[in-house]
């Protein structure tokens, strides 16, 4: 009873059995040393990692090596790492479609596999079925889409066939043959037949003055600095010689029957804005598409688009056009791209005064320094002492510089209290010295071509000024737009917030307004420009923009430019006003000036029109608006401003509330909006009046907003009555027949005298 049961002693065999059981799942790691393909780390075929051309803050990550096609095996016991080469996949010599019949071994193997997989579902088959079903759905959608597209095309073709008369078929062919224009005026420039054919198809009968003056010296290999007024055709002045060099290179390549090598760009064109870069690519691309035998590939490098895609496009590009920021990002992050770009034959800097101005476009200076660096293999840091000795003293490329303003004095702020210099236009000597310090020209003295030395403004541009109170700018802007109902108008402001507010205000007043500023996404910016410039768009469309649209944009049909804010610098005014009166057309430019902006506007007139002092023409004419019109439309603008200010204030309060709520959650504290409001109400100081107005505007109820919208809608449904008796229509100077036909200005009911410049 008291004896304890003795436990059987376990011999070493039992421990061995346990070890065997535990070792079963790790047989692969225990016997990995016996596997074939395991090699030492130093025996692998390591490859050096290719670093970008310019890598900042590398932190010692130089000399990195990589290996492909190797499996890493880690032992469970001691954690030792071993490397095993992947076995190459055996290529199946027999085709999958070949059938060899059934065999006994195959049946036995298939039976065993079916028994093993009977209990467990095959996940790969399920995935394959799901994938097949998705592909089938995609194919069905694609087929349906193609069918609808074919039906539409057939319908369009049938409509076109119905509209064509049988007797006009040969006349249509003759019109296509006679499509080109007479380009005999271009023959003196020494252009090739291919380029002349493209110019003929584009209907450019005569070259502009800047094209006549600049194309021959560029074809002769000279460095050129071109100064011409806005809208004078500077793009083709450098685009045509680049395409001529492309054709010459193409002919020499075909004559020598040289082997095909990787494409090297022949030209780099830098522009300050994305919109201007897109426009340059469009204009040069039109010449390429119309000229027979010219197949130059253009790479457009601007922000807002895929960086990897632009790097791929750059590998086979002949002409590279872009903004400095994205061009430098692509070049510095790529492999061998800087070395490739050093072989370019043309460096074009459009709007050079903006790109080379102090404190702006740091990337432009980086690009210029990288293009001139001649170090074998690597590009050392710019801070090194030997960097000055490594710059190429004379570049082998042509440098072409174009702008409408080169005077550094024009970039001085007009409203500043600092020393104000005279308004004399920059002389040729001063411009040359300024650019020679910034750029590495091939020649000691590049050719300076000033087509219009007397005035920087277009000849057919009419300039005016409207004086008003600071709080009445919205009212006078709306009145000016009513005076020009069928004019495509461009409104410039000095801030992004003003663009957003004015766009909403004009849209509330039922005017077709679009916005353009630098904070917009790239696709939205392109969409706004496309809608504004489309021939099918409303002829009275309005584009409210910052100075991002001031340079280079060539939009046909802009008749009217309004400066809602006086420009900060004189060169900004020159480029803003240059959006109209382009290529010999007429245009108007009006500044809405408040009393605090008057000093800057007076300085502006003195700077821009310095050489017109002895002429009878007044540079900026004072325009008087009809006070009857201003008083009648004041109620409209007041209601629209209250609606817009209320919406903006509510959006601002909502965004601030969301930010404070998120910050409180991150800190782990309770958020009480009333407590924050009470604390803000106790504060004093600058900005309290504005905050109080925003709070009052944001507290407007939905019912009040609906009432204001209804009242505004009723006012907008009627014309502005300027002294017409609604009971006795035949009295006064009203032309009833013209009103019934819809002639004249449909915004007014009565006779309104147009603005006289």
UniProtKB/Swiss-Prot annotation:
One Gene Ontology MF term: RNA helicase activity
Location(s), subcellular: Nucleus, Nucleolus
Domain Helicase C-terminal: 460-626
Cellular compartments per GO CC: nucleolus
Top-rank lineage group of the source organism: Eukaryota
Entry binding sites for ATP: 228-235
Keyword Nucleus: yes
UniProt feature, compositional bias: Basic and acidic residues: 1-10, 71-89, 112-136, 144-161
Residue ranges of the motif Q motif: 184-212
Entry annotated with the keyword Phosphoprotein: no
Name the record gives this protein: ATP-dependent RNA helicase mak5
